[in-house]
């Protein structure tokens, strides 16, 4: 009989949700070949980002995601106290990210989206369907944080200029790009036997085919957005990333977006949100974690 229990303690629900959020960000970063985005091949359309930086940034956010889940467990309901706690924790997480990356914004949009989803999942751990988690996240997003900084982000400025839905509105409407595009395509491609990496690429492309990506609009205007949406649809129409014809179209899209300096960072954040909701829906947080 051993004198000590050498087994690792079971992670708490908050720890497990933070694990899943960070895993989703790393899985998104590693996914290759993504058009004009940082991946295992290179930096895409970015001069200030690389894969190692994306990994370090994701890992730096683990404490913030855990604290968001803990806040949801403590406060127990959708309301202004939780919304403002999430805002404060998110801003602290952003500072930790910037300290890690030397001031480069790697995951600001992801802190917002995944933070809301982590908190929403913690509020009702047994209600794991993607729709129910997204609805709770939307109810949180609709509440006004009195302490949020007033200056508009680049994404918010672009959303106003072009009259499109930004990251804030995407969350407030219950993540339609995730529930209607990313997750259904992920499941379809899996069902067709395309393999997990191809299924994730197809999910990204499905989001890109319809999303008014404010990152693309900021960097390349309406021409860039049109190229992204039409090119992504062409890949899917050719059979997706698992087919030879689809791969050719994907390569063409990559070159076109690189030429336009159009990096679909908004779509990448929503792919990470799709991957997180997929894991929550499968019961990974509840099955491996406990309060």
Curated annotation (Swiss-Prot):
One of its GO terms (molecular function) is ATP binding. It comes from the Bacteria. GO terms for biological process: prosthetic group biosynthetic process. InterPro entries: CitG, TriPribosyl-deP-CoA_syn. The keyword S-adenosyl-L-methionine does not apply. Its EC number is 2.4.2.52. Involved in the formation of 2-(5''-phosphoribosyl)-3'-dephosphocoenzyme-A, the prosthetic group of the acyl-carrier protein of the malonate decarboxylase. PANTHER family: 2-(5''-TRIPHOSPHORIBOSYL)-3'-DEPHOSPHOCOENZYME-A SYNTHASE, TRIPHOSPHORIBOSYL-DEPHOSPHO-COA SYNTHASE. Belongs to the CitG/MdcB family. NCBIfam families: malonate_mdcB, PRK01237.1. HAMAP family: MdcB. This is Probable 2-(5''-triphosphoribosyl)-3'-dephosphocoenzyme-A synthase. It comes from Pseudomonas fluorescens (strain ATCC BAA-477 / NRRL B-23932 / Pf-5). The gene is mdcB.
């Amino acid at each position: 009989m051993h004198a000590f229990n050498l087994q690792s303690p079971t992670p708490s629900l908050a720890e497990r949700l933070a694990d899943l959020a960070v895993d989703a960000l790393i899985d998104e970063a590693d996914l290759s070949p993504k058009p004009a985005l940082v991946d295992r091949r290179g930096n895409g359309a970015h001069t200030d980002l690389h894969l190692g930086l994306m990994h370090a940034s994701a890992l730096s956010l683990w404490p913030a995601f855990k604290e968001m889940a803990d806040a949801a467990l403590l406060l127990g309901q959708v309301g202004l106290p939780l919304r403002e706690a999430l805002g404060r924790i998110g801003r602290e997480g952003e500072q930790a990210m910037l300290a890690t990356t030397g001031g480069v914004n790697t995951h600001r949009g992801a802190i917002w989206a995944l933070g809301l989803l982590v908190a929403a999942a913690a509020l009702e751990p047994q209600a794991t369907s993607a729709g129910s988690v997204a609805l709770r996240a939307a109810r949180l997003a609709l509440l006004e944080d009195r302490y949020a900084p007033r200056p508009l982000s680049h994404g918010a400025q672009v959303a106003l200029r072009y009259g499109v839905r930004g990251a804030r509105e995407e969350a407030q409407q219950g993540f339609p790009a995730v529930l209607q595009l990313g997750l259904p395509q992920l499941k379809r491609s899996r069902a067709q036997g395309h393999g997990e990496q191809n299924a994730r690429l197809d999910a990204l492309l499905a989001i890109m085919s319809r999303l008014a990506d404010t990152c693309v609009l900021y960097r390349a205007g309406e021409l860039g957005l049109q190229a992204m949406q039409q090119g992504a649809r062409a890949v899917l129409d050719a059979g997706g990333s698992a087919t030879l014809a689809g791969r050719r179209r994907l390569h063409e899209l990559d070159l076109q977006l690189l030429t336009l300096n159009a990096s679909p960072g908004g779509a990448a954040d929503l792919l990470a949100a799709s991957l997180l909701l997929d894991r929550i829906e499968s019961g990974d947080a509840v099955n491996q974690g406990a309060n």
